[in-house]
């Protein structure tokens, strides 16, 4: 994630944000498809059955989570991006509770508090006054969207059992991520 945020902040000066995301996932797909097209073709019926689920995973995990941090990097700081993106576990727990009616337990709450404390400690280098100087921008809203999208991707990936093996499913998710980004790449 750290390298993604650095590229998001620095790379957008040279390449438009959606282009970065589109070419990232298109490259992944193009490099992997020669090795995985046969299993996909053999399971074309499964592909058709799982089409919308795969598209949703590609949209949330590659499309939104791929483009939104790069868009955010145009107007916010890496520190803000890191702080906001670390909220993903909170959204995972809350959305899992809402969508799948999972109970939130004390250990999860303590884990989230410790996680956030650790992140804030690292970001502030132990100087809590740095956190009080955070200035929020429109880029932070884009990052919040990425964090929520990552949470949705994570809980659906965990709870949806595919008939494709993990790597083949990843290739298909990358493909749908590229497809979901393509119309925005054109503009």
Over which residues does each language-model region extend?
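Helix-helix packing/entry segments at the starts of transmembrane helices
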Residues: 21-23, 62, 66, 79-87, ...
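C-terminal transmembrane-helix exit sites in multi-pass transporters
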Residues: 31-40, 88-113
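Hydrophobic transmembrane alpha-helices of multi-pass small-molecule transport proteins
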Residues: 32, 104-126, 175, 181
